[in-house]
Amino acid sequence: MVGYDPKPDGRNNTKFQVAVAGSVSGLVTRALISPFDVIKIRFQLQHERLSRSDPNAKYHGILQASRQILQEEGPTAFWKGHIPAQILSIGYGAVQFLSFEMLTELVHRGSVYDAREFSVHFVCGGLAACMATLTVHPVDVLRTRFAAQGEPKVYNTLCHAVGTMYRSEGPQVFYKGLAPTLIAIFPYAGLQFSCYSSLKHLYKWAIPAEGKKNENLQNLLCGSGAGVISKTLTYPLDLFKKRLQVGGFEHARAAFGQVRRYKGLMDCAKQVLQKEGALGFFKGLSPSLLKAALSTGFMFFWYEFFCNVFHCMNRTASQR
């Protein structure tokens, strides 16, 4: 079970083991879902409608976008920005899961609330994600820039990107989109953790005979369901974040269609509504849901898997 478990037979992992499990979970998950992330970002940054009926639209579907990216940029394009993305995932996973475990334990020991309640998991999950976001946000901006650029490349290496961005846009560039990121990540991560816990309880209630026979499958399915629910409810804020993160990077976006500048979160929301309609808030939702189902499912699956491995190692060591 993710989060502090007061039961005597609960996992007894150290904080270091929790951080390692979170890091490895992030690393493996990122490698598997990177292509969906690249397609999602391309959709989010395209101002034209995602439709064949719009002659100016570069992308209009997942398969079409996949073929076009493959033809124009080669298979490595699906892992553009993968190094900063992996740094992001490893750091984010460690901070998020460690913070969540510590916060739920703090709630259990210092309040009257049960650490396993939906509301506790929602608040602790949201706060843990905010802590992780503040830690790794500069890397997220770098990842978005790498994934968003076409050919010819503006940034050749990670060091080149850091130097160019700092000289041309100043240090504040590394925290572009932070406000909508924090606003979006709190409910998104809160829903991930709380829905995951609730879906696991529902699964055990619906299929009590299963017990622990298919626990790994249960973790994967419940994680995927939690990912779809949380992503659907918070998607517009993710779109605003991506649009704001590429501000000042318009020259590299010219090959993808229209280019717009935004003054801030509210201006971005207003322009999207006026020029792209209400459906503009959900551009790229289909690859995002696919990505959310896979990434959240794998995230919880691998985290629980490695925590269980460490728990078994600790138990074996204590019995010697």
Swiss-Prot record:
A motif (Substrate recognition) lies at residues 241-246. It comes from the Eukaryota. One of its GO terms (molecular function) is thiamine pyrophosphate transmembrane transporter activity. The keyword Mitochondrion applies. It is found in: Mitochondrion membrane. GO terms for biological process: thiamine diphosphate biosynthetic process; thiamine pyrophosphate transmembrane transport. Pfam families: Mito_carr. Keywords: Antiport, Membrane, Mitochondrion, Phosphoprotein, Repeat, Transmembrane, Transmembrane helix, Transport. Solcar repeats lie at residues 13-106, 116-202, 214-309. Its main location: mitochondrion. It is a multi-pass membrane protein. The chain crosses the membrane at residues 19-39, 87-107, 122-142, 173-193, 220-240, 293-313. One of its GO terms (cellular component) is mitochondrion. The modification Phosphoserine is found at S51. Mitochondrial transporter mediating uptake of thiamine diphosphate into mitochondria. It is not clear if the antiporter activity is affected by the membrane potential or by the proton electrochemical gradient. Belongs to the mitochondrial carrier (TC 2.A.29) family. This is Mitochondrial thiamine pyrophosphate carrier. The gene is SLC25A19.
